[in-house]
């Protein structure tokens, strides 16, 4: 706007008749009356007419416009919200949550495989005809009953396993202990990392997981039965690079139940054949 006025004012002044009074209406809303007069002494004959210069009032108006620039632009309306940004990096693992509620009973499973053969008892020898009216016999020793019970227990099914972890694991996954040392009964599967019960009874399980640290993180390891956590252990990387997470349980298992160790965040050290991380269990006594 100021630039247009600076150009328009001189043009208006040039268009006015020389020596005549004129009026100017400027942007400052004031009227200026300033006649243009010829130079003293007139012009010599034959001299080329010179355009009149701007008046003093016009110069004052132009200086006033230069000193007071037009107001700034009016702020427009608020724009629409921008597009959502990209997802941020994945945060560290959170603390283990509490166990969930017990689920409803599952459907009845298929019939199990035939059980192991029972104990073979030897036939007793026939006794002679007793004497009528004989006296009472001497009481037997209770040690024989205890020995018989222990014999029946230890002569039952033999189920035990002891396995180690060769390759490292991290994140949230079932630990597949692939270094099998003992697997009586072949109830442990190294391809899945799970122990599958085939004989109902009371079992003992224990696990020891070495954390692969050095970056200030922690590791959680849970022993699960059919997806439900039955024991948990944590290892923290405080002042050292390695720490152990260990725990043990005694569980009653039915045929078809599965027991395994699940990593719930962190890094587990494998150790090739050194067996730094192990998982073992055995049958205490069958039902």
From Swiss-Prot:
Q: Which GO terms describe its biological process?
A: neurotransmitter receptor localization to postsynaptic specialization membrane; postsynaptic density assembly; regulation of synapse maturation
* GO CC, alphabetical: cerebellar climbing fiber to Purkinje cell synapse; collagen trimer; hippocampal mossy fiber to CA3 synapse; synaptic cleft
Q: Does the keyword RNA-binding apply?
A: no
Q: Where is the Collagen-like domain?
A: 76-118
Q: Which GO terms describe its molecular function?
A: identical protein binding
By its UniProt entry, which Gene3D superfamilies does this protein fall under? 2.60.120.40
Presence of the UniProt keyword Chloroplast in the record: no
Entry keywords, A to Z: Collagen, Secreted, Signal
Q: How does it assemble?
A: Forms homotrimers which can further assemble to form higher-order oligomeric complexes. Interacts with ADGRB3. May interact with ERFE. Forms heterooligomers with C1QL3 and C1QL4, when proteins are coexpressed; this interaction does not occur after secretion.
What is the name of the protein in this document? Complement C1q-like protein 2
Name its species: Homo sapiens
């Amino acid at each position: 706007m100021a630039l247009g006025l600076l150009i328009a004012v001189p043009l208006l002044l040039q268009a006015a008749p020389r020596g005549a009074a004129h009026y100017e209406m400027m942007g400052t809303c004031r009227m200026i009356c300033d006649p243009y007069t010829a130079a003293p002494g007139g012009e010599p004959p034959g001299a080329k007419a010179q355009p009149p210069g701007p008046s003093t009032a016009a110069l004052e108006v132009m200086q006033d416009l230069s000193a007071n620039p037009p107001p700034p632009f009016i702020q427009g309306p608020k724009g629409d919200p921008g597009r959502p940004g990209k997802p941020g990096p994945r945060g560290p693992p959170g603390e283990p949550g509490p166990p969930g509620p017990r689920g409803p009973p599952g459907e009845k499973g298929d019939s199990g495989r035939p059980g192991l053969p029972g104990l073979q008892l030897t036939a007793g020898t026939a006794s002679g005809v007793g004497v009528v009216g004989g006296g009472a016999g001497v009481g037997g020793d209770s040690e024989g009953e205890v020995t018989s019970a222990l014999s029946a227990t230890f002569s039952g099914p033999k189920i035990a396993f002891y396995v180690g972890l060769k390759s490292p694991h991290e994140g949230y996954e079932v630990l597949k202990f692939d270094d099998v040392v003992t697997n009586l009964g072949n109830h442990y599967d190294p391809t899945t990392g799970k122990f599958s019960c085939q004989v109902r009874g009371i079992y003992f399980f224990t696990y020891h997981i070495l954390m692969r640290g050095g970056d200030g993180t922690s590791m959680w390891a849970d022993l699960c039965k059919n997806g439900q956590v039955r024991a948990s252990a944590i290892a923290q990387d405080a002042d050292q690079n390695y720490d152990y997470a260990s725990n043990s349980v005694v569980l009653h298992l039915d045929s078809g139940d599965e027991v395994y160790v699940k990593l719930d965040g962190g890094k587990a050290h494998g150790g090739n054949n050194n067996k730094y991380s192990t998982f073992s269990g055995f049958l205490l006594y069958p039902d």
